[in-house]
Amino acid sequence: MNIQLINESDFTERFYDICEKWKLKHNPSSNLALVQTNERLELRKLNQPKLGAVAVNFVDGKMSYRRKFGGGRNEAIVKAVGVKGSYTPTIIDATAGLGQDAFVLASIGCYVKLIERNPIVGALLEDGLQRAYKDLEIGHFMRERMVLLPHSSITGLNPDLDSVDVVYLDPMYPSKTKSALVKKEMQLFQQLVGCDLDSDDLLFPAQQLARKRVVVKRPNYALFLANKKPDFCKETKKHRFDIYLSH
């Protein structure tokens, strides 16, 4: 993976262990850097410092605000996965990224298992989860409801042993416009991860694992995953959720 590994913390051994676990190698010529500070693990673009750093933070900031003041059970993603009344499905988020969608679902009572294929993103996500587990306000439900699995793809799971109610997919998709307003997370992610060119291959294994439905988040302008028409869609201003029911 093309990235610099920089330790700015007092936790040299911990940072070494993270790099070993995720098989990260230092590349001194990269303009992307994974940086361990005393507070967190973060991603920086060294040649564009004004972008700031990207880190996973469930405890405060925008994710905390969304949990407290967002739509809750009225959020589109919550409706898309089938939450209704006292029913909260078990979910695999197979393209977890920074864990933001999974956090919304866990916050309203869903049990979410996360899979992230990119090791740098996986390291960031694990760091954010570990800090959230220790938080007095949200730690109790985070430890129960958000778990990062030691797999890089759902293809490594066994449908007989690992099935859940819902599999959620949100693969990276090319941006329609080169807008200067693209979020810093997306700018860094697009350089780090690129687009998921093999995302079509996720639909079939997802359907094998999902007892009730597969939910695919797409930009409104995007084609259906694997060119397969869903049973129905739920649309928002910029995105839609394509829903494939298990038959």
Swiss-Prot record:
Entry GO terms, CC: cytoplasm
Catalytic reactions of this protein: guanosine(1516) in 16S rRNA + S-adenosyl-L-methionine = N(2)-methylguanosine(1516) in 16S rRNA + S-adenosyl-L-homocysteine + H(+)
EC number in record: 2.1.1.242
Record's keyword terms, sorted: Cytoplasm, Methyltransferase, rRNA processing, S-adenosyl-L-methionine, Transferase
The UniProt record lists the keyword Ion transport: no
GO molecular-function terms, A-Z: rRNA (guanine-N2-)-methyltransferase activity
Cleaved signal peptide residues: none
Binding annotation for S-adenosyl-L-methionine: E116, R117, S152, S153, D170
Localization in the cell: Cytoplasm
InterPro entries to which the protein is assigned, alphabetical: 16SrRNA_methylTrfase_J (IPR007536), SAM-dependent_MTases_sf (IPR029063)
Keyword DNA-binding applies: no
Assigned protein family: Belongs to the methyltransferase superfamily. RsmJ family.
Functional description taken from the UniProt entry: Specifically methylates the guanosine in position 1516 of 16S rRNA.
PANTHER family: RIBOSOMAL RNA SMALL SUBUNIT METHYLTRANSFERASE J (PTHR36112:SF1)
Record-given protein name: Ribosomal RNA small subunit methyltransferase J
Annotated source species: Glaesserella parasuis serovar 5 (strain SH0165) (Haemophilus parasuis)
Lineage: Bacteria, Pseudomonadati, Pseudomonadota, Gammaproteobacteria, Pasteurellales
